[in-house]
Amino acid sequence: RLIFDHADLKIPVGASVGIVGTSGAGKSTVVDILLGLLEPSTGHIYADSVDVKEPGNYRKWLKNIGYIPQMIFMLDDTIRKNVAFGVPEDKIDENRLWEVLKEAQLDEFIKTLPEGLETGIGERGIRLSGGQRQRIGIARALYNDPEVLILDEATSALDNDTEAAIMESINRLHGRKTLIIIAHRLQTIEKCDIVYRV
């Protein structure tokens, strides 16, 4: 069966776009298509009028995307290595780390820690709260300065107050990043410029 039939989503550069719907409606399918994990049976994905599936374009497209899932994968390692995930130790940019931690509103908390960026977070980030883990995920997604930020139900496991605080951090990026926010709660996307219901 078709999940989407004649779907036409327009996402303007710098806009905040919400995609909302019930479980099983196809929200994650949209994300999987944008991330290239699924290929549409028909149709195309264009970024600035360029088909991202054309040879040579796909890698460029992915480099422009920062992804924040519901469950952030955490290394049993330091805050530094969790934010600069996948970056070789000698290539980690200290200034960039602090920039993205500030964007994620986690910098002040880290400055209070005796070991700062070298603080171990434990297995699956057990030494951090759910909100702090999500903020590490935000900082990680921002580290490589993507143009597009996709939040795939990134706040759905958080309590209302923590979700509101995380969304405040995200909404501060409005206009500087293109935000695609997948949610099942309307309050999560209340500040979006455009909302698609699936």
Predicted regions: what they are:
Residues 44-63, 164:
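ABC ATPase NBD Q-loop/coupling interface
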Residues 20-22:
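The feature captures the beta-strand-to-loop junction immediately N-terminal to the Walker
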Residues 149-152:
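Catalytic Walker B motif of ABC-type/P-loop ATPase nucleotide-binding domains
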Residues 143-147, 176:
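A short, proline-enriched helix->beta-strand linker immediately N-terminal to the Walker B motif
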Residues 172-181, 189:
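Conserved catalytic loops of ABC-family nucleotide-binding domains
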Residues 35:
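Helix-to-loop junction immediately C-terminal to a conserved catalytic motif
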Residues 46, 62, 80-123, 167-168, ...:
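ABC ATPase nucleotide-binding domain helical subdomain, centered on the C-loop/LSGGQ "ABC signature"
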